[in-house]
Design a protein with these regions (language model features):
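Extreme N-terminal starter segment of soluble prokaryotic enzymes
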Residues: 5-10, 36
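Pre-active-site segment of Zn-dependent metallo-hydrolases
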Residues: 15, 28-68, 72-88, 93, ...
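Short beta-strand scaffold segments in enzyme catalytic cores
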Residues: 20-26
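N-terminal glutamine amidotransferase
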Residues: 2, 26-29
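A short, charged/proline- and glycine-enriched loop
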Residues: 4-6, 61-62
Length: 130
């Protein structure tokens, strides 16, 4: 019979640090279709966070869906970077989180912009990406 009637998920945690939650799930269905679902896309907050936050280890345009667990910046802080780099799909979360995310990302952008300026670095994303 082989694997043709099997459903399986490959889970790739794309971080080794405590913050920066970002888990890519590749779901393979019995009919052969594949969906890529990203669970969270958070900011790293470790000492070398500016460097850690600059890149995503996957192509955002290849992600089918994003699911956000809650609005803490270490779970949502790189969503604007995801959008800036090509993600155009929907972001799924609870109603309460969807309201709070807007405020969290606006505040986060101000902090990121200021820290980038102090470090003489380019900001990760622009205000329009928020």
């Amino acid at each position: 019979m082989g694997n043709k009637n099997r459903f399986y998920v490959d889970v790739m945690a794309v971080h080794k640090e405590v913050t920066g939650s970002c888990i890519l799930n590749v779901i393979k269905f019995p009919d052969g279709t594949t969906k890529k679902v990203l669970i969270d896309c958070g900011l790293f907050q470790e000492p070398n966070y500016l460097e850690l936050n600059k890149t995503l280890p996957f192509k955002p345009e290849n992600i089918d869906y994003v699911i956000v667990t809650h609005n803490h910046v270490d779970h949502v802080g790189r969503l604007p970077l995801l959008v800036k780099n090509g993600y155009r799909g929907k972001i799924y979360t609870s109603m309460d989180t969807s309201i709070l995310i807007r405020h969290a990302l606006a505040d986060s952008y101000k902090v990121i912009r200021q820290k980038a300026k102090l470090a003489n670095e380019k900001c990760l994303y622009s205000e329009k990406d928020v």
